[in-house]
A protein has these predicted regions:
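Noncatalytic, beta-rich nucleic-acid-contacting surfaces in large DNA/RNA-processing enzymes
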Residues: 1-749
């Protein structure tokens, strides 16, 4: 008998009840699950979303049954018990009751909810092929994505068209700087580069045609494949829009907004490299997805990884802000990790919420009390409104808003529509608090101001829990299976700096990092109990994945065998005597991965500084700067710390603009921002990321008052080569920042 979508979804929920072992839980818990499922199902069915839930669940369940690693959840989907029972998520809402289902689906919603899913980047195509097989290849496709010109590709295209010499193009390309805080389309801008670096300007003046590249920046260059979006149609997609094929992959000539407008069913399956790393880890250890999903979130040894600050390679926790907030919070349990995820963002950091959370948590101050109901909703976050769900609960329970009205506020928060959009509900909130909870207008007004301020940066707790769970898994791997963790992480690290950090961290954990071994290496990194981390053939410069696979087959394949000498590799097509010689030199080098280069450079520079008198001698290393404890004053403005002199290798330069920075955070106009500035003629400032032999990142900041004086000096720094000696003050903030007023450049050669 054919079941309706509603009947089938109920059946899958009953299967999920058994799969999750709900029947083995206490009666009170079972009653809670049953009531929640009935409530959610009523809303899902009434909105016509049952088919969508079934469709999504089917694809994810198939993937999990095939051993494809999927993340525990993403976004507000994790708040749904139905999603948990149908195996869309692995987060139990009963365990984390701060999550709100209404954040996922509310009564005012007419369009299907967003269900974003993370899966292994190496097997995402398997999910696509399953959908194509089940629904027909002509009905399945990838969403397109508009690609815009940025500094480097506009430079490359312009140089090619006007036959500009390669050396000129590379001179400018190597000087392109980041610009954060503004429109992402104009990050890594050529205009910034030409303004900042005299030698870049010289190239532009020598080859005037290159100025055309500036006109391309920000314009559409073409289309690519969206990183996550898949669509399924009930009719051939070519009946709806144009489709083009690239390498056998069908791509719509629509972006995600146009695809939704056309009525196509959209799935967001993001191929996440962390999930790919986990897939490799499971293969190396022989563990299964079930083992991964069963990791207890109260594992003390894993929590200790975070308490030690041992977060290199840990998903969502190794960034400079998260690293600093993790250190300040000093987590005691899993939910503290979710709080760190939410607090390590510009909004709460700049608003002082992160600092106040830490102060209250460690008993340095009392939480601000506005009303007992607000205290109840913020008890677990030390009196701070950190999450969107806390705001929604205040609106619902304290002000008596119905879910339709709460849903409208939810959209204002999630779409970041700004304070003006909040004000439409101000009077309703004031009246609602008085009529529902007997709260005076004065107190309600204070609560409202707190809501409006928090609403501009508050985070989704379901997403914070989901991604903290993924971070917890990676920390568990690092703690209990370190060899396999490092090998899998190195195999998936997508840039040289990430690989360097992982290798240095492995050495710090007494795990050796060895170059390729003729008869022991595979294509990429592999763990060895006796030797440590053995590099693969792909780690040798000039050896690509295809060549590495041929070497691997020759050594480990059915017809393969041990190599007698490096010269045996010459039997492989594409590998000649010179290549073999280079491979042998790399494999026998003293420091093939450059793990001691920074140490050698800094030792050489420090010896030079001790012998001369023109440049101040450093007083602190990066690690010593990080250990300086910074205090906050009552207004949460960071006070200036001690005077310091620091020396480190300049790695990257980030140029920023006050107008762009504030406008992106506050929504204020340029005129409004300029009125608040002292010296509105000074707008630019910059940050230089540095390392020394302690491998502690230090952010050298040049404020807008000092920038005009130091602009030329900053422009003369050769990144990834020069050592800079800076004089300034240690200041508080994420990372290890130093506000400087003097910069000296040392050429280590």
């Amino acid at each position: 008998m054919k079941l309706t979508a509603e009947e089938l979804l109920w059946d899958w929920c009953r299967q999920g009840w058994r799969y999750r072992g709900i029947g083995n839980q206490p009666r009170a818990a079972q009653d809670w699950y049953e009531a929640r499922i009935r409530y959610e199902m009523e809303l899902i069915v009434s909105k016509g979303f049952a088919d969508f839930i079934l469709f999504t669940s089917d694809a994810i369940r198939w993937g999990k049954d095939q051993g494809i690693p999927f993340g525990p959840g993403r976004g507000s989907t994790a708040a749904s018990v139905v999603a948990y029972h149908t195996r869309i998520t692995e987060i139990d809402p009963f365990k984390y009751q701060g999550m709100l289902f209404e954040r996922f689906i509310d009564v005012s919603r007419s369009d299907p909810p967003d269900i974003d899913v993370d899966c292994s980047d190496e097997r995402r195509d398997d999910v696509y092929n399953y959908l194509a097989y089940k629904y027909g290849a002509e009905c399945v496709g990838h969403i397109g994505n508009f690609v815009r010109y940025r500094g480097k590709n506009s430079l490359v295209d312009t140089a090619r068209v006007y036959n500009v010499p390669k050396w000129a193009k590379e001179t400018v390309s190597n000087l392109i700087v980041e610009r954060s805080g503004g429109d992402a389309r104009f990050d890594e801008s050529l205009a910034d580069t030409a303004e900042m670096f005299p030698n870049a300007r010289d190239v532009f003046d020598q080859f005037p045609d290159l100025w055309q590249a500036l006109r391309l920046e920000g314009n559409v260059r073409g289309m690519s494949i969206h990183a996550a979006g898949l669509v399924v149609s009930s009719t051939p997609i070519t009946d709806i829009c144009a489709v083009y094929e690239r390498n056998g992959v069908r791509v719509l000539a629509l972006d995600k907004y146009d695809a939704e407008y056309a009525g196509l069913l959209k799935l967001d399956f993001l191929g996440l490299s962390t999930m790919g790393m986990i897939a490799r880890f499971l293969e190396m250890t022989g563990l299964t997805l079930a083992d991964l999903y069963a990791i207890p979130d109260d594992d003390k040894e894993t929590i200790d990884v975070f308490r030690r600050g041992d977060v290199v390679g840990i998903f969502q926790f190794e960034g400079r802000a998260a690293k600093q907030v993790n250190r300040d919070v000093y987590p005691a349990h899993f939910l503290h990790l979710a709080d760190i995820n939410a607090l390590a963002r510009p909004g709460p950091l700049l608003a002082g919420i992160t600092a106040e959370y830490c102060d209250v948590r460690h008993g340095r101050r009392q939480a601000t009390h506005l009303h007992p109901m607000v205290d109840e909703f913020t008890r677990d976050t030390y009196g701070q409104i950190v999450y969107q769900e806390q705001i929604l609960r205040i609106l619902k329970d304290m002000a008596g808003f119905d879910w339709f009205s709460v849903g409208q506020i939810r959209r204002v928060i999630s779409k970041k529509l700004g304070e003006a959009s909040f004000q439409k509900s101000y009077q309703d909130f004031i009246d609602g608090c008085e009529n529902t909870s007997g709260v005076s207008k004065e107190v309600a007004d204070k609560i409202w101001k707190r809501i409006v301020t928090s609403g501009t940066y508050s985070f989704n707790i379901a997403h914070a829990i989901s991604y903290s769970m993924l971070g917890f898994w990676t920390a568990w791997m690092k703690c209990h299976h370190p060899l396999e963790f490092y090998a899998a992480s190195l195999a998936k690290a997508d840039n040289a700096e990430a690989r360097y950090r992982l290798m240095k961290d492995a050495l710090g954990h007494d795990i050796q990092v060895v170059p390729p071994i003729l008869n022991a290496s595979r294509c990429t990194w592999r763990p060895s109990e006796s030797l440590g981390l053995i590099a693969g053939w792909e780690q040798i410069p000039g050896i690509g994945a295809k060549t590495a696979a041929k070497i691997d087959e020759m050594r480990w394949g059915e017809e393969g065998g041990k190599f007698r000498a490096w010269s045996d590799l010459e039997a492989i097509p594409g590998i000649g005597p010179k290549t073999v010689e280079k491979m042998g030199v790399f494999a026998t080098a003293h420091d093939p991965f450059g793990l001691h280069t920074t140490e050698k450079t800094m030792k050489k520079v420090r010896n030079f500084l001790r012998k001369q008198k023109q440049v101040p001698k450093p007083t602190h290393t990066g690690a010593q700067l990080a250990d300086i404890v910074m205090q906050n004053n009552e207004s949460h403005r960071f006070v200036k710390g001690p005077r310091v002199i620091y020396a480190g290798i300049a790695k990257s330069l980030n140029l920023q603009d006050v107008i762009e920075n504030r406008r992106s955070r506050s929504g204020q106009t340029e005129e409004e921002i300029l009125k608040t500035l002292k010296r509105p003629d000074l707008l630019e400032f910059c940050s230089i990321r540095c390392y020394d032999e302690t491998d502690e990142e230090v952010y050298v900041r040049v404020n807008r008052f000092q920038f005009p004086k130091l602009r030329r000096t900053v422009g003369n720094i050769a990144l990834n080569h020069d050592v800079i000696v800076v004089v300034g003050n240690r200041i508080a903030g994420f990372g290890t920042p130093v506000m400087v007023d003097q910069i000296y450049i040392i050429d280590p050669d």
